[in-house]
């Protein structure tokens, strides 16, 4: 053993040893990551003065393990035929390290490339399952000069040090411009990594990695026990920081090859696609190999990406603006043109509009690289098979507001059905899709809808996109079922023969027909097309019931009728002219929703995230008795507490929720949860953000305890719900689709304005 360590100075001299701290920042001088799945650096303890390691083993014991690790890594690396200088350096060490093989210790599983070593005694940490090589090509990577993760991390670090949105846009715009100029083929992966996604929402690609897997990977990669990692996490509350600190404290002989963007992105996608036997061990293996190539702040952002939260103020709308600015500047420079501020503003609007219609960077980014923003609207249009973002409605507290909003314009009232928003697509080649409001592909969940298409689609409808509500239907009595019945349907692997609750489509809009987008067609014309191309089929498909009303009395009557017909209330929409156009992703005042239950309350229900719970008392001692809920601020990527909820539950509800939530309990509050730090205000347990509940409240009030929309109305106070009541679980939405902080502030302002109007007997100000 002494022989190995006595030779380290000579290895440094002969092999031109380069310290990690001198790593070059110029992207063109970075090493590109290896083609194979193995790490290109060797870990050796460089300190002979330490008497004990952090995991309690003696220095000599640690050196024995690391010596054999060094042998196995070098032996594995001999299979690399790239002939790079790094491999030659490692081969020089192999001959010395092999002399120590007789120690009898087997390689620890913390070795990022030791999975091929089948010999040796067992170690305290089990060896991972052999991992197939990740597909990459080191030689091609080096020739192409791919972008590195280090450059992205530099941009992220700058963003973490500012809260100014314009600065954040400028930082990301500059970063994207550099990628366009130097590595255009990497732009798509860079965009996805910046928004922490692996593909379009409808692709269904999600990492789905829990804290336990990440902790285990960090521990095995850095030579620490799981208990040590848990202890560090409990202290700092950020696994990214734990990984960064652990990696920095890990001695290394050589700097690792730079982690390239394509290699990282492909690795994350492979993790997302892993399933079946031993998939957990395989995921850990990939994470370890990625960590072994990280330096500086890279481990922090890698781990945060795996967790699904970068914790930067990088909302997707910010990325869109930055990407538009970078694209406009790149093509202006390329064509020798000067870019004006007006050009930038127009470019931002073009990209926003196109992305709302066609939310797929897979299709948009290649066009941006090749042609810029000028022809984007003509090329990237609404397309069957790719879900567009749905148009949303504003809530209203009183029917008179409807008449005030629409004034003398023509409008229509439609039933608001109590079901699941469904965007139905039919392509020219006969493919059928059903997408949820958050672009999830629900086709496999609704095979009964798919097989009924021929009953309600007329032959002339060759391709189309419909906006509908999927509603539970009682086929025996031919009537609507409550949403709770529809929610009992399985979400995956649904077979028609096993379906107990059938779904019926209630269509209320058509967005695309036979090759033509209809978004800029007035609603009255879209409705005519809808009625001419489709026909009702009892229990399978029908049209949303509508009535064109003109007075408060007639609207009230239609509202009462909708409630009797098992609906939630009414949707009131502009019927003619440009204001009746369909606006994807926009919550517009040209659509208003009127719900019977909410006319005297907040004006709408809220969809809130379950983030904590309080143990029950009395009859509820065996379950959670109340819950801490929060709204979501997409700009700051924070979940902000809004209320403690303890009413509206049945005993069956509480039992079900306890069994669901106990599996996602976490040891401490997430660092992106905003809630009072006062001990008396803390819940008994905290949860991972996963479940979304619909909640109704009497009204809203300012609060020093709850942090919802803090800073929107008052700098030091948030907004809370008074007398909240549980309505239902929102299985059709992800937790990131929760009611936003901005919406909460709008509800509060509307409430204050309405109160002032009643008190003073004067019209409320438009902008309170």
Curated annotation (Swiss-Prot):
Ranges where the record places region Interaction with target DNA: 309-318, 490-492
Residues reported to bind Mg(2+) 1: 469
Residue numbers spanned by region Disordered: 42-139
EC number: 6.5.1.1
The keyword Cytoplasm belongs to this UniProt entry's keyword annotation: no
InterPro entries registered for this protein in UniProt: ATP-dep_DNA_ligase (IPR050191), DNA_ligase_ATP-dep (IPR000977), DNA_ligase_ATP-dep_C (IPR012309), DNA_ligase_ATP-dep_cent (IPR012310), DNA_ligase_ATP-dep_CS (IPR016059), DNA_ligase_ATP-dep_N (IPR012308), DNA_ligase_N_sf (IPR036599), NA-bd_OB-fold (IPR012340)
Location in or out of the cell: Nucleus
Keywords of the record: ATP-binding, Cell cycle, Cell division, DNA damage, DNA recombination, DNA repair, DNA replication, Ligase, Magnesium, Metal-binding, Nucleotide-binding, Nucleus
GO molecular function: ATP binding; DNA binding; DNA ligase (ATP) activity; DNA ligase activity; metal ion binding
SUPFAM superfamilies: ATP-dependent DNA ligase DNA-binding domain, DNA ligase/mRNA capping enzyme, catalytic domain, Nucleic acid-binding proteins
Low complexity: bias regions: 104-124
The keyword Transmembrane is annotated on this UniProt entry: no
Reported cofactor(s): Mg(2+)
Site-annotated residues for Interaction with target DNA: 165, 438, 619, 644
One GO biological process term: DNA repair
One cellular component (GO) term of this entry: nucleus
Reactions catalysed, as given in the entry: ATP + (deoxyribonucleotide)n-3'-hydroxyl + 5'-phospho-(deoxyribonucleotide)m = (deoxyribonucleotide)n+m + AMP + diphosphate
Segments of skewed composition (Basic and acidic residues): 52-99
UniProt cross-references to PROSITE patterns, sorted A to Z: DNA_LIGASE_A1, DNA_LIGASE_A2, DNA_LIGASE_A3
Principal location class: nucleus
Role according to the record: DNA ligase that seals nicks in double-stranded DNA during DNA replication, DNA recombination and DNA repair.
Protein family membership: Belongs to the ATP-dependent DNA ligase family.
The protein's name in its UniProt record: DNA ligase 1
Top-level taxonomy: Eukaryota, Fungi, Dikarya, Ascomycota, Taphrinomycotina
Gene symbol of the encoding locus: cdc17
């Amino acid at each position: 053993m002494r022989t190995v360590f006595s030779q380290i100075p000579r290895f440094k001299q002969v092999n031109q040893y380069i310290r990690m701290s001198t790593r070059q920042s110029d992207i063109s001088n970075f090493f590109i990551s290896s083609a194979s799945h193995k790490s290109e650096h060797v870990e050796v303890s460089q300190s002979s003065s330490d008497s004990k390691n952090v995991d309690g083993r003696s220095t000599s014991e640690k050196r024995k393990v690391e010596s054999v690790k060094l042998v196995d890594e070098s032996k594995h690396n001999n299979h690399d035929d790239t002939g790079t200088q790094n491999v030659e350096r490692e081969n020089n060490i192999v001959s010395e390290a092999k002399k120590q093989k007789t120690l009898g210790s087997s390689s620890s599983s913390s070795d990022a490339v030791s999975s091929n070593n089948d010999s040796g005694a067992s170690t305290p940490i089990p060896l991972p399952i052999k991992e197939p090589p990740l597909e990459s090509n080191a030689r091609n990577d080096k020739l192409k000069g791919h972008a590195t993760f280090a450059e992205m991390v530099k941009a992220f670090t700058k963003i973490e040090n500012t809260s100014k949105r314009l600065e954040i846009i400028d930082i990301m715009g500059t970063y994207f411009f550099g990628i366009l100029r130097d590595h255009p083929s990497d732009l798509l992966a860079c965009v996805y990594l910046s928004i922490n996604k692996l593909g379009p929402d409808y692709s269904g690609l999600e990492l789905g990695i829990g804290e336990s897997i990440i902790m285990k990977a960090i521990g095995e990669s850095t030579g620490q026990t799981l208990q040590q990692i848990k202890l560090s996490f409990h202290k700092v509350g950020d696994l990214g920081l734990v990984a960064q600190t652990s990696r920095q404290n890990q001695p290394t002989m050589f700097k690792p090859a730079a982690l390239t963007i394509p290699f990282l992105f492909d690795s994350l996608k492979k993790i997302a696609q892993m399933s079946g036997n031993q998939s957990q061990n395989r995921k850990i293996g990939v994470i370890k190999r990625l960590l072994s190539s990280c330096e500086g702040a890279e481990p922090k952002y890698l781990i945060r990406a795996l967790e699904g939260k970068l914790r930067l103020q990088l909302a997707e709308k910010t990325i869109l603006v930055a990407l538009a600015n970078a694209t406009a500047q790149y093509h202006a420079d390329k064509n020798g043109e000067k870019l004006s501020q007006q050009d930038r503003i127009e470019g931002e609007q073009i990209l926003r509009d196109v992305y709302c219609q066609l939310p797929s960077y897979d299709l948009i980014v290649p066009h941006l690289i090749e042609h810029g923003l000028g022809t984007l609207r003509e090329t990237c249009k609404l397309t069957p098979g790719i879900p567009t973002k749905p148009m949303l409605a504003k809530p209203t507290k009183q029917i008179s507001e409807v008449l005030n909003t629409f004034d003398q314009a023509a409008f229509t009232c439609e039933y608001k059905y109590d079901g699941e928003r469904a965007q139905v697509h039919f392509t020219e080649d006969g493919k059928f899709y059903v997408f949820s409001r958050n672009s999830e592909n629900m086709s496999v969940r609704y095979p009964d809808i798919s097989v009924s298409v021929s009953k309600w689609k007329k032959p002339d409808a060759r391709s189309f996109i419909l906006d509908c509500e999927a509603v539970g239907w009682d086929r025996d009595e031919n009537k609507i079922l409550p949403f709770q019945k529809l929610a009992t349907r399985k979400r995956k692997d649904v077979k028609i023969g096993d379906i107990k609750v059938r779904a019926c489509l209630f269509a209320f809009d058509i967005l695309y027909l036979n090759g033509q987008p209809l978004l800029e067609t007035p609603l009255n014309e879209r409705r005519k097309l809808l009625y001419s191309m489709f026909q009702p089929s009892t229990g399978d498909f029908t049209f949303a019931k509508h009535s064109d009303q003109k007075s408060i009395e007639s609207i009230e009557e239609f509202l009462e009728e909708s409630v009797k017909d098992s609906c939630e209330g009414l949707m009131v929409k502009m019927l003619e002219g440009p204001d009746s156009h369909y606006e994807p992703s926009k919550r517009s005042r040209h659509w208003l929703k009127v719900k019977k239950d909410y006319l005297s309350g907040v004006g709408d229900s809220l969809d809130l995230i379950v983030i904590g719970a309080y143990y029950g008392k009395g009859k509820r001692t065996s379950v959670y008795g109340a819950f801490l809920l929060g709204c979501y601020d997409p700009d700051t990527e924070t979940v902000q507490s809004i209320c403690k909820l303890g009413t509206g539950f049945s005993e069956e509800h509480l039992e079900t929720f306890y069994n669901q939530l106990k599996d996602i309990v976490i040891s401490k509050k997430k660092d992106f949860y905003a809630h009072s730090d006062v001990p008396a205000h803390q819940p008994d347990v905290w949860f991972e953000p996963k479940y979304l509940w619909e909640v109704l409240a009497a009204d809203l009030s300012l609060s020093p305890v709850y942090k919802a929309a803090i800073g929107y109305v008052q700098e030091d106070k948030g907004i809370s719900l008074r007398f909240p009541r549980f309505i239902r679980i929102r299985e059709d939405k992800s937790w990131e689709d929760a009611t936003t902080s901005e919406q909460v502030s709008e509800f509060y302002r509307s409430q204050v304005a309405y109160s002032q109007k009643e008190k003073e007997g004067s019209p409320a100000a438009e902008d309170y």
